[in-house]
Amino acid sequence: MTHAPTPPAASNFLRPIIEDDLQANRFQGKLWAGKPGPAALQAQGQPDPARIRTRFPPEPNGYLHIGHAKSICVNFGLARDYGGVCHLRFDDTNPEKEEQEYVDAIIEAVHWLGFDWQADGNDNLYFASDYFEFMYEFAEALVQAGHAYVDEQSAEEIRASRGTLTEPGTDSPWRDRPADESLLRLREMRDGKHPDGSLVLRARIDMASPNINLRDPVMYRVRHATHHRTGNAWCIYPMYSWAHPVEDALEGITHSICTLEFEDQRPFYDWILARLAELGKLARPLPHQYEFARLNLTYVVTSKRKLLQLVREGYVDGWDDPRMPTLFGLRRRGYTPSSIRLFCDRTAVSKSDSRIDYSLLEQAVRDDLDPVAPRSVAVLDPLKLVITNYPEGRSETCSAPRNPHDPQAGVREFPFTRELWIEQDDFREEPPKKYFRLFPGNTVRLKYGYVVRCTGFTKDESGKVVEVQAEYLPDTKSGTPGADSVKVKGNITWVSAAHAVPAQVHLYDRLFADAHPDGGDKDFLACLNPNSKQTVQAWLEPGIEAVPGATWQFERLGYFTVDSKDSRPEAPVLNRIVTLRDSWQAA
């Protein structure tokens, strides 16, 4: 197989920023008390051993997908490369949608991807819910300082009063209520004395700001809901735009790296941090938010709503279906953690939205597996080949490299017998031009075995060819003197019919046939690829140990792995990871 040239390292606009920060000693004097906390706690700490701190902050309301992998690699990778620490933080501020199941799955997925958050004796696994008391304390401080107020308008009234991109908003009638009155209402909200949606806490900023996100954004809302960690201890929950900067500051994050949709929220992020630092609640230096373009792939949807619809309506077989873009789906498909990291490293970290061709992900797993995957042979669409002049009952050993790139891997041995399985596509009764495989009268090499000449074939009642006959040339066995005395143009793979291992093989392909299934007004379900999964009964080279997760390159076919859920020692099930070459047109 011809190797594609290794792509150059992708650009990352964040690296020069971090290098400038470190060169300017912007974090010199930053203290760390060994755990997150407000300014008073951090003042008791020691100089932070981490040169930078980043974080990966998923909400535990679903399974991680390939887009999350990019953010994971960016945040953990930058921390690793610059002597820092990356925190894993769960932004669990929305109790109706979050579950412990997702927490456990996210932890497993990040670990599987090859990253750890333990450093300097700290676990660095955190939850936004750990900071609810701090957030509430800070909210009271903002109210008392005149920076926030409790609004009793309905959600519809608040929405209508925000204005538009071209028109300013209008002040709430509650905007100028006395701080003591707002504080009383906030405490009533905290104590559960008001129903859902009746009151909110809003920041007092500027209702005429050209940035709508600064028009007195909501900070707290009433939600009488059970939280997966705190139970019923709270009935008010922070909005993400309020919680996010507070969490970052409490954890001593230096570089808060988000996707582009949070760019318009950055002024509020900075406003919150500045006000709380002025009030002595947060330690300086304060975090800074940076935004990069999210990873968008062709032939993929990553919307949680759409992925959930695929699962619930039975278009796929669960969240770990090998066609899904979830990390568990990719893992079951046979993608390795290193292949996903390689793919992420090859895609730029930039501020420009773009769509990456799915073939780059497939090429990453090819490049990752090619040097290490043992070779073997499988016949997916079997046709019987009988060597008529080979003695019945006889068997001899053929050999081949386990991996041509790794001489230390040694050789594999497999039997040659009178009856073999070959691919249906390797025989033609009437061959087209430039067809060099088996057809009546033609000579080919059985790879690693003998040269054979086709002498005939047999059809069933429907006219389908069910058996091919051939004669072998005894002095042409691969690896023996004179093996190349007969020149042939075709090589075909085979397995011994008497020794081959039967297996079920799932031939997976892209889930969508349309490169942009979620573009415009498309019905994404109408873009599904009807051939994204085909199941065949195959014959495998003997000697294969069908251990879940084991991976091979089946010669001429692609890379395959043993399914982690359905495979059994007595009944192997394999998944095709990727073909040897890309068969799709570039999007």
UniProtKB/Swiss-Prot annotation:
Its EC number is 6.1.1.18. InterPro entries: aa-tRNA-synth_I_CS, Gln-tRNA-synth, Gln/Glu-tRNA_Ligase, Gln_tRNA_ligase_bac, Glu/Gln-tRNA-synth, Glu/Gln-tRNA-synth_Ib_cat-dom, Glu/Gln-tRNA-synth_Ib_codon-bd, Rbsml_bL25/Gln-tRNA_synth_N. A motif ('HIGH' region) lies at residues 58-68. It is found in: Cytoplasm. Disulfide bonds: none annotated. One of its GO terms (biological process) is glutamyl-tRNA aminoacylation. One of its GO terms (cellular component) is cytosol. L-glutamine binds at residues 91, 240. Belongs to the class-I aminoacyl-tRNA synthetase family. This is Glutamine--tRNA ligase.
